[in-house]
């Protein structure tokens, strides 16, 4: 088999020991084409409504209610709906962690290793504009990509960090209702998708990543409230990175215990090796293999913190008492999106709406705290791209709405000047530019011209 010849022999030996009679089926999966998936953003559109307008041929991912397989040649990243944040392109099995974590309205949620944002975008959609999502990546460059993706998705109640998980754990001990850790790993489940990862595995394999995982999983447990839930996942098959990381957690944090993950055909249980595993109920973990399901592969463990674990008090952020500029208030009079004055803060001319669930800032590298509403410039207010994406079309009263088939939509996304023959197509001031009823960004009409205000760094390339 051509593709498996290049796999390291020590990896093949480990998989043969792991899979036993399924080993040949696993090798055969390398002859199959890689799979492509997209996940619908239910914060902006229902699955039913998206399927009515979808320009792509889609097949349901059986265990993900808002996930679908697509054909590579359809190129959904080159469609205006992608720029409107109606879906996220994600490997099918990688959709599982955020799907499994039982996020509820009003929860305070932490995504520890979040870039580029596949899990965070789903967690934010599940919160449905309630609660608070704090999302983090230790790498500043990756955190920038994360910030863009959560803003494209229109998630308003967020804070984006670029910080060491241990430092965050010290700051937010016992703070979160839900924690997701899609841990850095050796990536064995991605070999079929990207065979360049094989060289990375040979350089830094399971032993390298296991040390990192053992540290961050303890930090995650420490950040949970009593009764809180944590989802640990990897895209690797190594027992050292998977079940053994969970064993380490359960030994070090006896207040944590495994709870069942809803079963689907093809999910495999965690691997039991001894009586301790049985006592810990390691079989409640889930493994996804490419020869069992239509996905590249994943490991998941859902855990809960005992309700009688010690509680921690966190001082709430004080409401804003700032006097808001008249130009800002004038703009907000056109918006029906729920903006509370006591949640608006102005920092270095930038205007933010900060979740009331967010405690006092300090001591952390914050990329974005709250929804960036816009910026004050010489006594005028300029709304942000992030605000445009967080709005529904019905929440603003000056609209330009074009069908996806209109060539001006792509021109807008490229930052080009737009031609409108009919003056009724727009109004003075800031217009919300939409495609088929879904916001893309801003345009400003003044002095007889409509200026394209689509964010330069997001433009269609």
Segments and roles (model prediction):
Residues 1-18, 22-51, 296-299, 304-461:
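Polybasic, low-complexity RNA-engagement segments
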Residues 106-115:
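Conserved class I S-adenosyl-L-methionine
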Residues 116-129:
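Conserved SAM-binding loop of SAM-dependent methyltransferases across substrates and taxa
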Residues 127-128, 224-226:
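Helix-to-beta-strand junctions that scaffold the AdoMet/dcAdoMet cofactor pocket
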Residues 136-174:
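S-adenosyl-L-methionine
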Residues 176, 229-232, 237-352:
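Class I S-adenosyl-L-methionine
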């Amino acid at each position: 088999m051509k593709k498996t010849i290049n796999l390291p022999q020590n990896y093949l030996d480990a998989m043969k020991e792991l899979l036993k009679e399924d080993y040949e089926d696993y090798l055969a999966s390398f002859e199959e084409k890689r799979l492509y998936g997209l996940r619908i953003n239910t914060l902006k559109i229902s699955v039913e409504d998206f399927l009515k307008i979808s320009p792509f041929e889609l097949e349901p991912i059986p265990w993900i209610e808002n996930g679908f397989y697509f054909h590579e040649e359809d190129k959904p990243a080159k469609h205006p709906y992608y720029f409107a944040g109606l879906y996220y392109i994600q490997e099918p099995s990688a959709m599982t962690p955020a799907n499994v974590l039982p996020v509820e309205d009003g929860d305070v949620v932490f995504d520890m290793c979040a870039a580029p944002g596949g899990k965070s975008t789903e967690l934010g959609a599940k919160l449905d504009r309630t609660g608070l999502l704090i999302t983090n990546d230790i790498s500043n460059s990756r955190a920038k990509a994360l910030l863009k993706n959560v803003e494209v998705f229109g998630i308003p109640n967020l804070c984006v960090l670029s910080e060491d998980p241990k430092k965050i754990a010290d700051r937010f001990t016992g703070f979160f209702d839900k924690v997701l850790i899609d841990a850095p790993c050796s990536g064995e489940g991605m070999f079929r998708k990207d065979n360049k990862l094989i060289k990375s595995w040979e350089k830094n394999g399971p032993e390298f990543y296991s040390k990192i995982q053992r540290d961050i999983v303890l930090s995650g447990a420490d950040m949970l409230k009593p009764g809180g839930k944590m989802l640990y996942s990897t895209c690797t098959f190594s027992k050292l990175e998977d079940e053994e990381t969970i064993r380490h957690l359960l030994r070090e944090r006896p207040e944590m215990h495994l709870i069942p993950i809803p079963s689907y055909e093809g999910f495999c249980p965690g691997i039991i090796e001894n009586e301790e595993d049985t006592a810990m109920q390691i079989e409640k973990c889930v493994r996804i293999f490419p020869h069992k399901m239509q996905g590249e592969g994943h490991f998941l463990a859902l855990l809960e913190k005992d309700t009688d674990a010690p509680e921690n008090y966190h001082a709430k952020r004080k409401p804003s008492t700032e006097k808001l500029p008249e130009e800002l208030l004038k703009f907000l009079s056109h918006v029906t999106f729920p903006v509370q004055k006591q949640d608006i803060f102005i920092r270095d001319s930038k205007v933010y709406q900060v979740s009331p669930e967010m405690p006092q800032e300090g001591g952390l590298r914050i990329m974005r705290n709250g929804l960036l509403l816009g910026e004050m410039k010489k006594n005028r207010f300029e709304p942000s791209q992030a605000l445009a994406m967080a709005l529904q079309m019905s929440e603003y009263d000056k609209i330009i709405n074009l069908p996806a088939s209109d060539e001006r939509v792509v021109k807008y996304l490229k930052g080009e000047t737009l031609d409108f023959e009919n003056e009724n197509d727009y109004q003075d001031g800031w217009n919300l530019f939409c495609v088929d009823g879904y916001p893309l960004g801003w345009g400003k009409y003044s002095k007889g011209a409509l200026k394209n205000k689509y964010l330069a760094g997001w433009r269609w390339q």
